[in-house]
């Protein structure tokens, strides 16, 4: 066993002595040592129940004849961090999480790992670590939150609350109505109930094969999630016996399938960023053009909030992720069904008995929302290395208009609230990319304000930052190269005409190459917003969004 490094041989007497101080007995040294990587944090609703969750995982590991050791990671609640300096720390926290898990697990030579994530950057951070460490691993997330209901019976979620702010600001609802939405938008523990980033990543974890069937859709408060815990411990033991590791599971084909599910569900645009980072950790050469190829062959089968009034509980009721995958598998060439997963079985075997139980929620191949996926990769002179739009969250497929430029999210939000944005405008929020932000903050507050004011179909928003999974409308993010790297978005001037063509996958500014070259020569890189601390270091090391915004290792040659 891998853990023999710290427990076998006469020279490991000091190590065993220390381990006995934690409560171990001699007989425990013949059992696999299992890292329980938890993320219990009281300020995050999706994680406040994970303390008890961790206890159940440890019980299940002991029952399977293994020895559990629990530790915790940090986390950031993107909703609470939204709209202020805290959002700069969200994406960088992914790297800290990955590094911290790598540190604990490799320092103590565990034989296997069960990861308990749930929310936005915590799931991909742990997944990156699992691929980096590459020991048998199973993921069991904390589960989605249920949707809420206002006193009038209206179904609401977190995106309803954000959009309620814009609606109140524009006089569409009263303060009492906003308070009613606030009080009921997040009714329980769990990851926010729509197809936002947390749930998108937990669903992708399931299709990648690192988590068990049901991981993405079974609610946090559903007793079936406890059954998942028991299964996870049993399956981990099998993975250890068969030496099946994350890099055996997360192949190029698995990533294709993850993006295929993402397209079928219209998941968060953040999945592109995180899954490219996973490919990097797995040592795979996977670029955005391959994502676009997946998008072209996968139909959009279900719309989940914010693209509709359906939520994760409805997806679960309709058959869950397995039912979506089973329906997708009917179309030749969409999925790679014979690859191994954390169940010890193939994807084909995992979904063999799944079926759609509500075709209003999960559409059939014969009745898709669209013939192509709910995410699109756009390119053009404004995004030479690519940009991402959640095409399934807008009915508008082509938009052209003059740009209104803001050099920060704060500046943009103030301008929107002051009425500086009107119908037909293209709002540009720049210098908010991985380096420029720093941290590539999400733009949920501006998009929600625009939607809440009733301008969601009449105003487009472009940014080198990110969008929350709760964002909707004509929102193009991840524009690469970013402004801080001298990308074309930095060269835009007020009133330049920008064209977004979703069907043709184009993002263009109607300015000649000669004029752009002239502007590039005159452009000067702004001073970094942050020069010290973690964010200062992050801004120096982070790479572009089109490569997953991973950190580059200095070249020592």
Curated annotation (Swiss-Prot):
Catalytic activity: (2R)-2,3-dihydroxy-3-methylbutanoate = 3-methyl-2-oxobutanoate + H2O; (2R,3R)-2,3-dihydroxy-3-methylpentanoate = (S)-3-methyl-2-oxopentanoate + H2O
Cofactor requirement: [2Fe-2S] cluster; Mg(2+)
Pfam families, per database record: ILV_EDD_C (PF24877), ILVD_EDD_N (PF00920)
Molecular function (Gene Ontology), one example: magnesium ion binding
PROSITE patterns linked: ILVD_EDD_1, ILVD_EDD_2
Chain residues that bind Mg(2+): 78, 120-121, 442
Pathway as given in its UniProt record: Amino-acid biosynthesis; L-isoleucine biosynthesis; L-isoleucine from 2-oxobutanoate: step 3/4; Amino-acid biosynthesis; L-valine biosynthesis; L-valine from pyruvate: step 3/4
UniProt keyword terms in alphabetical order: 2Fe-2S, Amino-acid biosynthesis, Branched-chain amino acid biosynthesis, Iron, Iron-sulfur, Lyase, Magnesium, Metal-binding
Binding residue positions for [2Fe-2S] cluster: 119, 192
One of the GO biological process terms: L-valine biosynthetic process
Cofactor annotation remark: Binds 1 [2Fe-2S] cluster per subunit. This cluster acts as a Lewis acid cofactor.
N6-carboxylysine modification, residue list: 121
Quaternary structure annotation from Swiss-Prot or TrEMBL: Homodimer.
Family per record: Belongs to the IlvD/Edd family.
Name used for this protein in its record: Dihydroxy-acid dehydratase
Source organism (scientific name): Bacillus cereus (strain ATCC 10987 / NRS 248)
Gene: ilvD
